[in-house]
Amino acid sequence: MNTETTNQQTPTQESKPSTRPPLPPFTRETAIQKVRLAEDGWNSRDPEKVALAYTIDSRWRNRAEFPHGRQEIIQFLKRKWAKELDYRLIKELWAYTENRIAVRFAYEWHDDSRNWFRSYGNENWEFNGNGLMALRFASINDLPILESDRKYHWPLGRRPDDHPGLGDLGL
């Protein structure tokens, strides 16, 4: 028996080329769509699903962490959502160019002691021609809040279409 033939690996998500519309060059409308798709993905809190929006060798700076590649991104997100419970996020387009998008965002979460936080931040994204994010730079600050000060009350998952955005909420 030829072991080379029987031990061949099947293609994985790492080796399959993928496209993630909308694709660059972005218009205002497609940049807004891209931001909402990213928000929806992150609100799923599914690290494997979220990681598919990034290139195989995507580079991040998230606070003081520097994940590189999908596998490190998945591990980072698993740690994040194990700590940031009942996570709900709103993103808003700030600026865009041909293949770059800047967003501002705020998300609410609590720790395992039920201490609530609202985290504010900005992200800069750069996309390849297939619409996958190759670079992500995020700056984030956490503000402790009272549970009664929460503004995000939708059921876990995707933010409803009729829910106010950041500007509407005064954030």
Predicted regions mapped to residue ranges:
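Short, aromatic-enriched amphipathic alpha-helices that serve as compact interaction elements
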Residues: 27-44
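A beta-strand edge to alpha-helix "cap/lid" segment located at domain peripheries
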Residues: 2-26, 75-171
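Short, well-ordered alpha-helical segments enriched in acidic and aromatic residues
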Residues: 44-57, 61
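Short solvent-exposed beta->alpha transition segments
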Residues: 59-81
